[in-house]
């Protein structure tokens, strides 16, 4: 869940995808068009499904849809010994999604985000930082996009040039366990994918690390067009 947030409005997360397997919910993702979902590479798993149109895990929406992955794409130049390297996965669904009251895609960004931007985080992950407590509904919060140097200092061994740093130096609001793969939305644009953070979520001075979606737009578009040999930025 999201630390320091509140229940999302039921109409603000039509693009948010819930990943689940036999053990239950485990990650989030973002619907970018009727056939494709973007999530974190570290969310890859066997025998998972994706639910769209979900708000409460206990109260069904009449337009919820479930899909299986048909194809999964991870950067061919990813260093598999480093979990957070190129932490992005593109998934083709087994059949297209129909737009509905609670389901609609979110477009890829048209420009990179700016430091200082107010960004929205959301997910069904833990709402408590230490002993995990998972809510039935997604929580949302606003955080700030910070300068790279903040996360380079906080996570010297995890920082990548293709990542974003977002949160608050004093802590308080953050993504947490179960939010991985979900979106970071800055000024209305899909700019980041939840990747990594401090093991005690929401604790300063370590904000969250997000994969920078803008850096991967060319790779995403090439794969959707059928060029599966496309490589990701270094």
From Swiss-Prot:
SMART domains: Tryp_SPc (SM00020). Expressed by the venom gland. Disulfide bonds join 8-140, 27-43, 75-232, 119-186, 151-165, 176-201. One of its GO terms (molecular function) is toxin activity. The active site is at residues 42, 87, 180. Its main location: secreted. Glycans are attached at residue 21. It holds the Pfam family Trypsin. It is an enzyme of class 3 (hydrolase). It comes from the Eukaryota. One of its GO terms (cellular component) is secretory granule. Keywords: Blood coagulation cascade activating toxin, Disulfide bond, Glycoprotein, Hemostasis impairing toxin, Hydrolase, Protease, Secreted, Serine protease, Toxin, Zymogen. Residues 2-225 form the Peptidase S1 domain. Its EC number is 3.4.21.-. Signal peptide: none annotated. Residues 1 form a propeptide. Transmembrane segments: none annotated. It is found in: Secreted. GO terms for biological process: proteolysis. Monomer. Thrombin-like snake venom serine protease. Has arginyl esterase and fibrinogen clotting activities. Negative results: does not have phospholipase, fibrinolytic and hemorrhagic activities. Belongs to the peptidase S1 family. Snake venom subfamily. This is Thrombin-like enzyme acutin.
